[in-house]
């Protein structure tokens, strides 16, 4: 799981 995607998910959540 890429940090970039995690950044997006945390932004959405």
Curated annotation (Swiss-Prot):
GO terms for biological process: defense response to bacterium. The keyword Secreted applies. Keywords: Amidation, Amphibian defense peptide, Antibiotic, Antimicrobial, Secreted. Transmembrane segments: none annotated. GO terms for cellular component: extracellular region. Belongs to the frog skin active peptide (FSAP) family. Temporin subfamily. This is Temporin-1Ca. It comes from Lithobates clamitans (Green frog).
